[in-house]
Amino acid sequence: MSTAEIVAESANLDAELRRLFGQDTRVEPLLGAAQMGRRIHGVDLTQDLSAAQASLLVALLDHYNIISFPAQGGDDFQLRHLERLANHFGAPIPHPKNYANYIDYKKKRVPLALKPVPEQTATRCNDAFPGAITCVDGADSPAVYIVTNLPGSGADLQEQVASGLHWHTDIEFEPVPLSTSMFFVQNVPTTRDALGGTWVPNTLPEAGYYHPYSPAELMQRRLSLPLNGETAYTDTAAAFADLPLERQAELEQVMLRRRLRKGDPGWLIPLVYTNPRTGRKSLHSPVWASRGKNIAPVEVEGMSEQASREFLDQIEAHVLQPKYRYDHVHQPGDITIWSNFSTLHNAPPAKSVINQPEDARLMYRISCKGEPSYSLPRQDSDAWVEANILPPYRSPADWVQS
């Protein structure tokens, strides 16, 4: 789409937002009028959505890649509200770290069990600074992954800082990859005691974290990360649209073999994703080793491992150019939703162990896959859930029914 077309479509969506949610709603760019990301004021996501409202929110995400709703964290907010919202965008997936015996379940199909309450992440968060920070109700849902530095922290402990991660999308290494992820933000760090006035110093990964032959320009872009607890994003739809048409056509023919382990046969999936609702194209997770050594590197069909790495490194360098980048500043009470098909993101350097509540980073993430559902409860078949949600999971009925 041209800049004029993007602006025109934005105006149409903004008008529809006011019609469906009220004239007090307003939209502001996170970057610029022709760039990804919008902050949407005046929408209360604790309320049930009509089918028309849910359809509009999905359309807003399709168009903007990232949408953020401030001031959602009132006294009545619970994480069931976030999980109900997630069900409109896709089927929420449970996080393996919430279970006590997930590995045994995968290998032996023993009955699943959540961790005992004292070992659950929410309990460990509450124990870090008793009385100062308490998790939001519903944090024990299997679908809620708590992104935080509170477990293992406390007033008597030595502060520690960790480096950033690889650029990635959330769980692209399954045959049906995740479509959407979202955060509810409870706490963000407010101290700025590092040299340069940031929350943390620019802490680099240890040697061997990236492939030793990664190009210097790519490494500079990979490591150019924010230092105040933001989440770094880049726009892979805009990056694809800026390529010459001939190059776009070439990349649309590329198939990637993704797999968990090197010995697995894996499966083929297109490098270029086409949004089924808009026709908009984007580069879906064009990263050779987005999980380092934890997940097998991607192979380009018909290329050797080295050629695959060099090919994808070139594309990663393209999408990480500063003109496609956006560092999202989190605020308590925000709900921020992003498309995993049209963005990459990164968790930048952060304090991993803290000794004061002012350094706390506490956010709740839910990710989902499959098609949107404008009415709830979702109508995913048992066979689809069994094949694509591991372990099989549906949100509690009383959370998603009006």
What are these regions (language model features)?
Residues 2-66, 71-332, 341-402:
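Non-heme Fe(II) oxygenase catalytic core, chiefly the N-lobe of the double-stranded beta-helix
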